[in-house]
């Protein structure tokens, strides 16, 4: 069998295969994220509309399903722009708990933070990078 394909993505994320699960709202739950990670790809847990407590529980459930407890994984939160020219239908999916949710992501040992909708505020990016989260 040929060796696994090595790419900048596989090297950066410490994965076998250059396959990355999209955070896909709550569809990319603990079972799917763990399955992708266990298969050698990069599992990303979708964290849309979770409370901090729910996010912590979902991450714990996913980690329980991992074959390797130190396996890399990511968390995706929806952070659309609010106010200042943003669409009137945008709202804060974190319910004002972004800072607490970032603490949970950092404490969980997540490798990567994803914001598929919107750009995280600079303070959040700085906090994640300072903690070693990509």
Residue positions per predicted region:
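Active-site entrance/lid segments in N-terminal catalytic domains of soluble metabolic enzymes
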Residues: 1-134
């Amino acid at each position: 069998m040929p060796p696994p394909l090595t790419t900048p993505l596989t090297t950066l994320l410490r994965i076998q295969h250059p396959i990355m699960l999209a955070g896909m709202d709550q569809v990319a739950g603990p079972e799917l994220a763990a399955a992708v990670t266990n298969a050698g790809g990069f599992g990303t847990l979708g964290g849309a509309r979770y409370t901090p407590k729910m996010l912590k529980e979902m991450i714990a459930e996913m980690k329980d399903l991992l074959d390797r407890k130190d396996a890399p994984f990511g968390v995706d939160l929806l952070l659309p722009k609010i106010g200042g020219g943003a669409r009137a239908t945008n709202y804060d999916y974190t319910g004002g708990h972004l800072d607490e949710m970032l603490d949970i992501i950092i404490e969980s040992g997540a490798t990567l933070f994803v914001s598929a909708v919107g750009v995280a505020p600079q303070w959040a990016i700085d906090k994640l990078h300072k903690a070693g989260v990509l």
